[in-house]
Amino acid sequence: GAGGVGSNSNGNGGPGGPGQSSTISGSSVTRAGGGGVGVYQSGSGGSGGPGGGGNSQSTGGTNQGGGGGGSNMITPVRQGGSGVVVVRFPSDTPLSNSGGSPSTAPNGDKVIVFNGSGNFTVG
């Protein structure tokens, strides 16, 4: 979501908006995004909004995205919290993953294991 604005030209940026959360029908994958940023021309950036699921936190939790970072044009940008991708499958149906290759759940969903930082696109 979009951040709110300060009360004057040198005011602080408003808080970030809430993240988006959605459950994909018929799938074992649930995605929750982080909150939006607070943006203003001068002054401090706003704090992050609540992540998907309504939980205000710096990083993602189970089924919840983290809050977004504050941002403005003068002082350094604060990093936003992480969104999360949660993959669920029955505990009596073990999955294995070897060499970075995708595994496939019984319902056909692909389970991909990856490590790193920055921006990822999973499709």
Name each model feature, range by range:
Residues 1-123:
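Low-complexity, glycine/proline-biased repetitive segments and flexible coils/loops
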